[in-house]
Amino acid sequence: MGCKNLLGLGQQMLRRKVVDCSREESRLSRCLNTYDLVALGVGSTLGAGVYVLAGAVARENAGPAIVISFLIAALASVLAGLCYGEFGARVPKTGSAYLYSYVTVGELWAFITGWNLILSYIIGTSSVARAWSATFDELIGKPIGEFSRQHMALNAPGVLAQTPDIFAVIIIIILTGLLTLGVKESAMVNKIFTCINVLVLCFIVVSGFVKGSIKNWQLTEKNFSCNNNDTNVKYGEGGFMPFGFSGVLSGAATCFYAFVGFDCIATTGEEVKNPQKAIPVGIVASLLICFIAYFGVSAALTLMMPYFCLDIDSPLPGAFKHQGWEEAKYAVAIGSLCALSTSLLGSMFPMPRVIYAMAEDGLLFKFLAKINNRTKTPVIATVTSGAIAAVMAFLFELKDLVDLMSIGTLLAYSLVAACVLVLRYQPEQPNLVYQMARTTEELDRVDQNELVSASESQTGFLPVAEKFSLKSILSPKNVEPSKFSGLIVNISAGLLAALIITVCIVAVLGREALAEGTLWAVFVMTGSVLLCMLVTGIIWRQPESKTKLSFKVPFVPVLPVLSIFVNIYLMMQLDQGTWVRFAVWMLIGFTIYFGYGIWHSEEASLAAGQAKTPDSNLDQCK
C-alpha cells in the first residue's frame, strides 16, 4: 500500500498541463505588438549594466577585450533566447518558463521554475529600485542619503541595510500603480524611456569613437601610471587582451548577467496580438539590439580612457571627464535614470503575470488570479508582488541576493532548453501543445483523417513494431516520433543533464586538479564529455517531430545542449552562501506546494473529474 501511495504521489508531481486549444481565448487584454515587445525586452535587458558593468569588467577582468566578452555572453544568451522563442511560438500563453515546464516535464518542475522566477523578479525589482534611488540622490547632491543616516539609521549590521530607502519604496509604489492601470499604458511609458536611453547610448558611442584613441587598446606595462600608488591592484600585461583569454572568459561569465531580462517577453503570451510570431521576433531582436549597445559602449569606453584608470562605480562620467568634457555627465545621468526605469519596469512587468499563471493553475492561492474587469490586469498579484518588493527595497542591502537572483534565472533557462530538447522528439499530441502551435487557418485545413492518424499514433498503433534493442536506439525505422523514441529521448535527456552537471562540477571545483593533470580529474572529465557526446548522438538519431511552427530552434539537439551546459556552468560559479539561500527559498516553496498546490491543482481537478476520451479531445480541437 505504501509503494502504491508513493507511486500515486509521483504521478501527481509529474502530471502535465493540458493546454486549451483556443488561441484567441484570454482573460487578459491583447494589445501588444512586436514593437512593444522589442521595447520591453530592450528596456528590461539594457538597464544598469551598460552604465556600470562595462567599467568593472574592463578594469578587473578583460581590458579592451571586454568587447569579446560581451560577444561570448551574447552568444550564450541567444542560445537561451532561441529556446524561449520556440516555446513562445508553441505555447503562446502567460507564464513564460513556468508554463513551458508544465506542459513538458511536469507539475513539480514547473512549480520549481515558477517559484524561482518570482524570486528573481522580486529581487530584481528591489535592487534596481535602490539603484535608481541612489543615482537620483547622487545627481541632486545626496540629501536623501544624509537625512536617512541622521534620522533613520537601522542598527542591525549584517542583517538589514544601514539605512532604509524610502525613495525606492515610492518608486515601486508609483510603478505598481502604473502597471495596475493596464498593459497599454505601461508599455507606452516603457517605450518613451527606452527611446531616451537608446538615444543617450548612441551619443555615448559616437562621442567615444570621435574622442577616443586606438592607442588605449595598445598599452603596455610602462603606461600603468595613473594608479601606480595602488600596488595591490593587478592590471595585466597591457595590450588588447591584458588578462589573457581566461580573463575574457571570466568577463563573459559576468557579462552574461547583463543580458538577463529578455525572458519577460515570454510572459506576455496572452497580451500579444500575434504571439506565435511576435514573441520569437521580439526576443531575438531585443538581444541583438542590446549586444550592439553593449559592444559599442564598451568599445567607446576603453577607447576614451585607459582600462586601468576606469572608475568601477561610474565609468562613463569619468571617461568624459578624462577627455575634458565633464558636461556630458548630465546626459549620462539622464540615460542612466531612463535605463534604470525601464529595467525596473521590466522586472515588475512579468512578476505578477507568473504569479497569476501559477494561481490560475491552483499551485498558488486562488485569489491571486483575479483579473480587474476594467483594466484586464491581475491587480491583486501586481499589488502583492509590488508590496513584497517594496519591503525588501526598504529594509535590505541586496548585494548578497544578486547571485540568488541569477541562480533562479539560470535554472529557468536550463529547464526551457531541456523542454525544447524533449518536446522536439515527442509524438504529436493534438489535445495538448500541438494544436496550440497551429494557426486558425491551418486548423481549418486539417481533416479528420489526419487527426485520427495522430490519435492512433498516441494510443500505440505504430506503423512499425518496436522492441528495445541497440539497433532500435541507434537506427530507428520510424520516420515520425513514437512513444518508444520519445521515451528514449526522455531517458537520454535525464542522463545528459546528470553528465553535464558532473562536467561542470569537475571543471569548477576540480580546476586545479585538471591543471595539474591529476588522474581522477582527467578520467572523470574525459569520460563524462565522451558520454555526453554519445548521448547527444543517440538523441540526434531519433525521429524528429514534423510539427510546423512559426519559429524553431535550429541545430537541435546541439544548441539546447550547449545552452544547458552554459547555464549550469555559470550556476556552479556561485558561492556556497548563494546555494544555502537558494535551499531556504526552495524549502518555503515546497511547503506551499505540498501543503496547498498539489491538492488544489487544476490538473488534479480535471483528473478527479470525468476522464476525457480521445474522441472528445479531437472534437474540442476541431
From Swiss-Prot:
Highest levels found in the testis and bone marrow. Not found in the liver. The chain crosses the membrane at residues 36-57, 62-82, 103-123, 163-183, 192-212, 240-260, 281-300, 331-351, 378-398, 402-422, 486-506, 520-544, 553-573, 578-598. GO terms for cellular component: apical plasma membrane; basolateral plasma membrane; membrane; protein-containing complex. It is a multi-pass membrane protein. It catalyses: L-arginine(in) = L-arginine(out); L-lysine(in) = L-lysine(out); L-ornithine(in) = L-ornithine(out); L-homoarginine(in) = L-homoarginine(out). NCBIfam families: 2A0303. High-affinity, low capacity permease involved in the transport of the cationic amino acids (arginine, lysine and ornithine) in non-hepatic tissues. (Microbial infection) Acts as a receptor for the ecotropic murine retroviral leukemia virus. Belongs to the amino acid-polyamine-organocation (APC) superfamily. Cationic amino acid transporter (CAT) (TC 2.A.3.3) family. Interacts with TM4SF5; the interaction is negatively regulated by arginine. Forms tissue-specific complexes with ASL, ASS1 and nitric oxide synthase NOS1 or NOS3; the complex regulates cell-autonomous L-arginine synthesis and citrulline recycling while channeling extracellular L-arginine to nitric oxide synthesis pathway. This is High affinity cationic amino acid transporter 1. It comes from Mus musculus (Mouse). The lineage of its organism: Eukaryota, Metazoa, Chordata, Craniata, Vertebrata.
